Curated annotation (Swiss-Prot):
Name by which UniProt lists this protein: A-type ATP synthase subunit D
Quaternary assembly: Has multiple subunits with at least A(3), B(3), C, D, E, F, H, I and proteolipid K(x).
Main location: membrane
Classification via HAMAP family: ATP_synth_D_arch
Organism: Halorubrum lacusprofundi (strain ATCC 49239 / DSM 5036 / JCM 8891 / ACAM 34)
Molecular functions (GO terms): ATP binding; proton-transporting ATP synthase activity, rotational mechanism; proton-transporting ATPase activity, rotational mechanism
Entries under NCBIfam families matching the protein: PRK00373.1-1, PRK00373.1-4, V_ATPase_subD
Amino acid sequence: MAKDVKPTRKNLMAIEDRIDLSERGHDTLEQKRDGLIMEFMDILDQAQDVRSDVSENYETAQRKIDMARAMEGDVAVRGAAAALKEHPEITTQSKNIMGVVVPQIESSKVKKSLDERGYGLLGSSARIDEAADAYEELLEKVILAAEVETAMKKMLTEIETTKRRVNALEFTLLPRLYENQEYIEQKLEEQEREEIFRLKKIKAKKEEEEKAEAAAEAAAVEDPEPAD
C-alpha cells in the first residue's frame, strides 16, 4: 500500500526511476508480444497447410498400399518392406525466432532409389514402387509437420508468458508505483505547505519582536531617565 512508503524525496526519485524502467519494459514486452503473435500466425498458416498435406498424403499412401496388396499380395509387399537397406536419418538443429529457440529438423535418405530400397528391379512392381513413393512422401510431410507443430507450441508458450508479464506490469506493478508516486507527492506538498506556514509564523513573530524592540528603544529616547 502507498501508506507503507516513507514520503521522502529520495523515495520519490527511486519510484520515478522504477516507473521509467517499468514503462520502457512494458513497451518492449508489448512489441515482443505483437511480433511473436505475427510470427505465430505465419507458423499457424504453415501448420494448417502441412496438416492438410499430411492428410492428403496419408490417404494417397493408404490407397497405394491397398492397391499393391490387392495386386501383388501381402507376402510381396512385406518382402519389399523387409528388404529395405537404409533407414531415414533425422538430425535436429535449432533456430531463433524473436528469442524463442525452435527446432529445425533435417532429414536424409527418406526418398530412395530402387537399389536403396533393397528389392531391386526383379523383386519390384509398379504397384509396390508407387506405394513406396507415396509413403516416402508421407514421411517427409510428417517430419515437416513435427517441426512446425513443435515450433508453434513453443511460440504459443512464449506468447502466453509475455502476455502475463505485460499484464503484471500494466495492471499490478505500474498502478502500484503510480499510487506510491502520487502519495509521496501529496505528502511532500503538505510538508512544503506546513514548512512555508511555519516559516511565515516565525517571520511574523520575529517582525513583531523587532517592532516591539524598536518601539521600546524609541520610547526610551523620547523619555530619558532624569539625571541625579
